[in-house]
């Protein structure tokens, strides 16, 4: 009977801890970020919709690298790209993570509200391009991602994107919306190559 009580106590403690963990996880708006980054910053390997990634923390910055298939990264960055997260609250509450990377003439930003690519100082339309990938775009003076989704979900949405949505300001100071099909959308790197070729 004594052994049975010990066993039941262990079971109760397990469920109590599990429930407490769930409460903590749910309280963070970006709970799924734990699937991508280790809280202690040590390197972590995984995949998002079949696209492999490695994440780590270096010099206080969280870094996420996504890889094109089985390719080994090269110095020119043709088969991988990075998101360097330059701000986060702490190891346990990373819901305010904002990541950014710059390649060529455009910046890649990853925040708690969504995923955007912003390109500045481009000649077309005389304005600044705000580019985003979504099924139901909303074009405003500043692009707004309408869904507050988890990091893993909008990364997956970006990887599976079928077309590029963008807006720009024309000569009459009016925002014009447009779109462009993305080929070979199953790979993140093809999206970036399309962007690089397009501009």
Protein language model features and the residues they cover:
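Classical Sec-dependent N-terminal signal peptides that target proteins to the secretory pathway
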Residues: 1-28
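A generic "folded-domain core" signal
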Residues: 25-199
């Amino acid at each position: 009977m004594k052994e049975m009580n010990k066993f039941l106590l262990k079971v109760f403690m397990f469920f109590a801890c599990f429930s407490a963990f769930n409460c903590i996880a749910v309280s963070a708006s970006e709970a799924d970020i734990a699937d991508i980054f280790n809280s202690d910053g040590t390197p972590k390997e995984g995949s998002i919709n079949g696209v492999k990634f490695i994440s780590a923390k270096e010099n206080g910055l969280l870094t996420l690298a996504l890889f094109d298939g089985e390719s080994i990264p090269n110095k020119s960055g043709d088969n991988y790209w990075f998101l360097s997260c330059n701000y986060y609250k702490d190891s346990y509450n990373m819901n305010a993570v904002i990541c950014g990377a710059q390649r060529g003439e455009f910046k890649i930003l990853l925040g708690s509200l969504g995923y955007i690519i912003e390109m500045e100082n481009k000649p077309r339309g005389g304005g600044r391009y705000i580019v985003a990938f979504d099924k139901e775009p909303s074009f405003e003076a500043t692009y707004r991602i309408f869904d507050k989704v988890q990091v893993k979900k909008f990364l997956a949405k970006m990887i599976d994107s079928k077309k590029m949505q963008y807006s720009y300001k024309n000569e009459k100071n009016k925002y014009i919306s447009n779109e462009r099909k993305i080929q070979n959308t199953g790979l993140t790197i093809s999206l970036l190559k399309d962007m690089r070729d397009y501009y």
